[in-house]
Amino acid sequence: MKLSMPRFDQAPVLVVGDVMLDRYWHGGTSRISPEAPVPVVKVDQIEDRPGGAANVALNIAALGAPASLVGVTGDDEAAESLTNSLKAAGVVARFQRIADQPTIVKLRVMSRHQQLLRIDFEEPFNTDPLALSAEVYSLLDGIKVLVLSDYGKGALKNHQALIQAARKRGIPVLADPKGKDFAIYRGASLITPNLSEFEAIVGHCEDEAQLVTKGAQLMQELDLGALLVTRGEHGMTLLRPDQQALHLPARAREVFDVTGAGDTVISTLAAAIAAGEELPHAVALANLAAGIVVGKLGTAAISAPELRRAIQREEGSERGVLGLEQLLLAVDDARAHKEKIVFTNGCFDILHAGHVTYLEQARAQGDRLIVAVNDDASVSRLKGPGRPINSVDRRMAVLAGLGAVDWVISFPEGTPENLLTHVKPDVLVKGGDYGIDQVVGADIVQAYGGEVRVLGLVENSSTTAIVEKIRGQG
């Protein structure tokens, strides 16, 4: 399945559900309390993040999609913190504020990146479902997907009215379900329970075959358009009526914190579907997104650049021939992993042993090697009529096959200054016997603090000499 980055900027999504504030107290622990056998945490940082339905909306906005949110809060400091955070992220939030009830707050005490304790401040909201529905109805005509983010806290009491209103307008409804009565989601386009939530409804599943069978029965009973069961380290399974089940393996490189992973799944699904992606592609994107977010601490959102880089890795563009946009993303990803970027350039018309040795030496100057190749027109200008012998596509394909080379890109100019300005490598390498001040682009690299290194050429290795020898024998 080939993946690409959707046009999220044209994919408005409305999220309705249980809004909460995730609050973190960060501090150090160096002693045990004399009052009880518990650690003493000296709090040095307090952090607020949108949680629940607010985190879903935040994730959608972080992908670049227009996001609106309808929910219920108290009339308190926590509600103000939520409102300010969402506004800063570009989320249009419309809250029904209840004066005599607190905003739901999940307080986590953290030390050394570990959660020591969670304290919940909450009461089930006694809301007017008609007022909330009216707010939703007023926004339906401007959206492409409706998300019901249900945590069972009382904001959602009229699921069927919302689902039917959206269906009448042809708007897909995605629901992240809660509780032991999935009948309230009847008619939804897609529901996304995790395995525990799913088995609480259908019973324990011995294997994937039983999961598929029970899932198909549930879809038929509830008239669901599709069912996505998220299964932790086992990935996720997409079920659709009369179609083969789609099992996707987990994509997490490292699991650090699963908080909010379900929010990331449904938000990526919603944004992708709103952008026109087919459901299997949207699920694959959500699977990639979940693999990224579980590597972060606490309730976290995935950004568009992070998802784009994950798509590149999935499509095999982590190495090889890239365009400028792909290369810049790959470089950003490498830098995020503290890797040193090395850059060299040339015509590389007929690749020979001298080239291979030089490129291996260049790669040894850092962690990642970019080889910029003159295109055919620029080679002809530099080398004269009859050159290049090999087209730029063939030259790049051969270079990309070398173990020392990570990324190959072509450029039309005679020299690579434009590329250097965009890429900003840590090290610029050139082969020859001249001084650093004679290396083209050295001034650009040195201006931002990069290094320039000159490597010696391998004797008796020259493309021009090889070409002349071939022509002489012809």
Curated annotation (Swiss-Prot):
Catalytic activity: D-glycero-beta-D-manno-heptose 7-phosphate + ATP = D-glycero-beta-D-manno-heptose 1,7-bisphosphate + ADP + H(+); D-glycero-beta-D-manno-heptose 1-phosphate + ATP + H(+) = ADP-D-glycero-beta-D-manno-heptose + diphosphate
Protein name (record): Bifunctional protein HldE
One GO-annotated biological process of the protein: ADP-L-glycero-beta-D-manno-heptose biosynthetic process
Binding positions (ATP): 194-197
CDD domains: RfaE_like (cd01172)
Complex and partners: Homodimer.
Zinc-finger in keyword set: no
Catalytic class of the enzyme: transferase
Recorded metabolic or biological pathway in which this protein acts: Nucleotide-sugar biosynthesis; ADP-L-glycero-beta-D-manno-heptose biosynthesis; ADP-L-glycero-beta-D-manno-heptose from D-glycero-beta-D-manno-heptose 7-phosphate: step 1/4; Nucleotide-sugar biosynthesis; ADP-L-glycero-beta-D-manno-heptose biosynthesis; ADP-L-glycero-beta-D-manno-heptose from D-glycero-beta-D-manno-heptose 7-phosphate: step 3/4
Active site: 263
Region described as Cytidylyltransferase: spans on this chain: 343-474
Family according to the record: In the N-terminal section; belongs to the carbohydrate kinase PfkB family.
Organism: Pseudomonas syringae pv. tomato (strain ATCC BAA-871 / DC3000)
NCBIfam families tied to this protein: cyt_tran_rel, PRK11316.1, rfaE_dom_I, rfaE_dom_II
GO terms for MF: ATP binding; heptose 7-phosphate kinase activity; heptose-1-phosphate adenylyltransferase activity; phosphotransferase activity, alcohol group as acceptor
Gene: hldE
A Pfam family: CTP_transf_like
GO cellular component, one term: cytosol
